[in-house]
Amino acid sequence: PASSSIGPTYQRYAPMPIQPDIYTYNNSDDTSSEPAAGIAQSGAAAELAAGLLDDKAHVSPKYLYDTLGSKLFEALCLLPEYYPTRTEDAIVAANMASITQAMGPDATLIDLGAGNCAKAARLFPMLQPRQYVPIDISRDFLEQAAAQLQPRYPHMRITPLGLDFSHKLDLPASIPAERRVFFYPGSSIGNFSPDQASAFLRRLRNACGTDGAIVLGVDLIKDAAVLQAAYDDAVGLTSAFNLNLLRNVNR
């Protein structure tokens, strides 16, 4: 969930617990000359064509997230205007005890759209999952983040998966079927149409089983000026992030 107000006073911080060097864009580790590795290339052209030829032309937000797009979004979340990240962090921190009590230790934490893994990592000290499964469409970026995270939690199994979970969720047999907790923060559910969101939540419900749980972040109604500032920032990061979608799909 996210508060209906802008939230706590913004303070610049280094997202934890990833090493700071992951936040510096470096051409030497950018694999974005290729489309996001988690996208099935065989179906991408047909999906893009169908969206662009629709009565309301659209492109799925998943195409925002190649390596460069993931780094741009990471930087965007630190902007003063971008309230969702810090507000949601504050809500989770304020309710951590009740979240932990409801879930209990030793669950398998499955982080959908994990990015740099920083949001889920804040849950580790209290939730103490036995396994962490970050999932993201930008495989190279995700694997770099997971590799930096593993030494900090040597007793926890970290299994990064680069895949597109927007239409189906096929988890490998190495992911225990019991005590699955799906974590989907950031109000990303808003990227789906109502019908798509319903189908997506049903898939999560089926995947988490009878002893699992879903932690879902959803933004509330905001003043137009707040949204305008958050999604059309003064330094142009959101613009660069969105334009990178064209760069990605044109490859």
Residue map of PLM features:
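Class I SAM-dependent methyltransferase Rossmann-like catalytic core
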Residues: 57-66, 71-103
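Conserved SAM-binding loop of SAM-dependent methyltransferases across substrates and taxa
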Residues: 116-128
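Conserved beta-strand signature within the Rossmann-like core of class I S-adenosyl-L-methionine
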Residues: 207-220
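Class I SAM-dependent methyltransferase SAM/SAH-binding core
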Residues: 129-167
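A short SAM/SAH-binding and catalytic strip from SAM-dependent methyltransferases
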Residues: 179-198
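N-terminal auxiliary segments of SAM/dcSAM-dependent transferases
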Residues: 17-63, 70
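A short glycine-rich, Lys/Arg-flanked "PGG" loop and its adjoining helix->strand segment in the class I
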Residues: 198-210
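Conserved class I S-adenosyl-L-methionine
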Residues: 106-115
